[in-house]
Amino acid sequence: MSRFLVFALLLAGCQAQPPPAKPLVIRITTGLPGMTFKPLGEALATAFQAVITDARFEVIETAGSVANLQRLESGNADLGFALADVAYTAFNGRGMDFPTAAKNVRALAVLHPSAVHVLVPANSTARSVADLRGRIGVGPAGSGTAVTSALLLNAFGVSPKQITNQSLPFITASDALSAGELEAAFVVAADPVDAVQRATNAGARLIEIGGDQVRRLRVEYPFLRPGFIPGGTYKREPRSIQTMLVDVLLLTRVDLDEELVRRLTSVLFDVLPQLSASHDFLRMMDVRRAPATPIPLHPGAALYYREQELSR
C-alpha cells in the first residue's frame, strides 16, 4: 500500500464526525393554572413522550385559546388547545383578534365540551345575559372566554356602551365578584372549575343561558349547543343550570409532518382511558365526534380516522 493511500485513510479516520441530530421539539401551548388546558397539556405531553421517544415535548403556559391559535399560526407552537368557536373565528379571519385568517392551523380532534358559566352576585337582579350591565369579567385577554362572552353579549343585545369589560384572570374575577367589584363574570371551561367553585362558595350564583337568542346564534355558530351544568356541581346550585356548551379542539399546524400527526392522533386515543381516569372532563369525550371539527383536519389526523373506519 502506498504511503499516500495510508495517509489518506488515516486522514479520513480523523475527520470530525457530524454532531448527532437534535431531537424534534414539539411545543404544546395550553392555558392558565386552575383551568383545564394546562393540566390536560401536561398529561398529553407525558403520554406522547412515553411513546414517541424520538421527539421532546414541551408545555407552554398561555392565556388560552386566542393566544394558542396565534402561536400556532405564527409557527411558535406545534400543538395547542382552543374552543371551537374561537378556532372557527380564527380560521375564517373574523373579529379583532384575527383580522387575517389563520390558514396555517389544522385540527386533530374534538376533545370534550366546555360549559359557559355566567356568574353574578347573590343580590343581583340579573336573570339573563340580556340583563347584564356595568363591570363584566369577560375573561383574560387571549382567552377563549373573551371571544365567547363577546358573542353571547352581542347575541343578547347588550351594547358595549352598557358594560365595562374587565379582562381579568379567572380567580381574580371570582374574588372581584365576591368583593362587589364586578357585576358579572364569564368562565368557559369544563366542570368543575376552581374559579366558579370559589365564587359560588362565596355566595355568587349562576344564571341560565337559553331562548331565541341562542337559537339565532347557533345558525352562524352551530357548534355552540345547548346543555346543562349538572345540579350539585357547585355550592348553592342544587338544580341543573341551562347553558351553552362549546367543544375544545386539539390543534396543530398544517406543515407538521403527516406521519407524526397520525402517530400523535393514534396515541391520543390509545391513552384516552388512562387520561379519563384522572381528568373527569375527558369522560365526556365522544370518540365518534372526534373528527367533526369546524376547521379542516390535518391530513395526518384524517389518515388516522380513515384507518379506523377501514379496520371496523
Give residue spans per PLM region.
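Sec-dependent signal peptide recognition
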Residues: M1-F7
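C-terminal motif of bacterial Sec signal peptides marking the signal peptidase cleavage site
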Residues: L11-G13
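Bacterial signal peptide processing site
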Residues: Q15-Q17
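Bilobed "Venus flytrap"/periplasmic-binding protein-like clamshell domains
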Residues: P23-V51, A55, P113-A179, P291, ...
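Extracytoplasmic small-molecule ligand-binding "clamshell" domains
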Residues: T36-E73, D78-G80, R236-P238
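Pocket-lining segment of extracytoplasmic ligand-binding domains
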Residues: A84-V86, R94-M96, S124, V158-L250, ...
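A structural signal for short loop-to-beta-strand junctions that line the ligand-binding cleft
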Residues: F98-L111, V116, T233-Q242
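Segments of small-molecule ligand-sensing domains
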Residues: I241-R312
